[in-house]
Structure formats: structure tokens, C-alpha cells
């Protein structure tokens, strides 16, 4: 459960991301594909090369979904219901992949926002991404 401090930390950190949301989303995807090659199996139709327009476009989708989640931090199930359906019923993404992407997002944010990425902010973002992952995998049960 996200505390009021966690919510404030997440919102403040996401404000710092600002217009870089697509760029950071794409970078996190690239990190995931390089660090966890099995995740590539969900993107057989993508050009996964560095700087690929398809990875950039999907990174923007990921970033925009997280921006939506931050904006609806008190109702993540409502905000992410359609995405949960998509990933559970159509794409059938293995739930572990959300944890892998979350880790890569944390690394990406830490590398771009080092002075803002305090231990407290890190913990809050980790809890937030875990909450998002839980919602996205809730329809699997």
C-alpha cells in the first residue's frame, strides 16, 4: 500500500521525468531486452536494435501508461483496467516480465535523475511500480 509520502515522492519524481517519458520508457525497454533476452519473445515483429522506431514508440506507450497511473495513483485498478485486460487476455505476457521492466525503469530513472533518486524516492517508486505490476497481473488469477 502506498503511503501519502510514497504518493508525493512518486508524483515529484514523475514531474522531473516530464517530457522525457517516451525516451526513458524506450531506454528501459532496451535495458530489459539486453539484460533479460527472453523478454524479446513478446516482440518478434519488432526491430529491437538500439534506437529502433518501434522500441521508441512502445517506450512512449509504457511511459504514457505510467503517467496515467501516476495521475490516478489512488485508483490504479480503474486507470489500468484496459491494459490489464490486454496483457492478460490478448498478449498473455508472463507476469514476471513486469518485474523485470520495473527494475529496468528504476535503473533508467536513477541514471537520469541521480540527485533526485534518494533512497526514499527509490523505495516509493519501487512500491509504485510493484503496485502497477500487481494491477496489470490481477486478471491472470
Swiss-Prot record:
Expressing tissues: Red blood cells.
A GO cellular-component term linked to this record: blood microparticle
Gene3D superfamilies: Globins
Residues with PTM Phosphoserine: 3, 35, 102, 124, 131, 138
Binding-site list for heme b: 87
Coiled coil: none
Name assigned to this protein: Hemoglobin subunit alpha
Organism the protein comes from: Pteropus alecto
Lineage of producing organism: Eukaryota, Metazoa, Chordata, Craniata, Vertebrata
